[in-house]
């Protein structure tokens, strides 16, 4: 989803707020709470989880280990939820033809709010480059902007899961907007 006008192109960069991250953070949180609850119920000697016979689990050593796994899972789950909350890796690509600049903005990095701008004059943009690597279990599609005097700037990351036709369409739209050629594969 991008916003296009004759002189402005804004493309959001999806950070860590993805369905898969929500799913895994929820599963890990549920599992950690389950381990912690079973370990605690073995400590007090009462069955706090009715479907399980957790009162039959000895606190030493099984209950202690389950409490440890539960606490470790809570720490890992809280880390995932913080990356989702702060949307680590999120930002936008913005191309302003009027000012003749390409601006890359990344909002959050490692829990700190970081404003990162990369300003590139549009006259230095050479091509839009598509890189496709496919294997049996994994395919990697990345869209780059080749700029004179700089390393290739990634525009669409692997985690965006473009299929080949979507990536070609996006590359064609961007190349047409910037009036540059496409370099492929």
UniProtKB/Swiss-Prot annotation:
One Pfam family here: Ycf4
Compartments reported by the entry: Plastid, Chloroplast thylakoid membrane
Domain of life: Eukaryota
Cellular component GO terms, alphabetical: chloroplast thylakoid membrane; photosystem I
Keywords: Chloroplast, Membrane, Photosynthesis, Plastid, Thylakoid, Transmembrane, Transmembrane helix
GO process annotations (BP): photosynthesis
UniProt membrane topology term: Multi-pass membrane protein
Transmembrane segments: 22-42, 57-77, 101-121
Predominant place of localization: plastid
InterPro entries in UniProt: PSI_Ycf4_assembly
UniProt similarity note: Belongs to the Ycf4 family.
General function of this protein: Seems to be required for the assembly of the photosystem I complex.
The protein, known as: Photosystem I assembly protein Ycf4
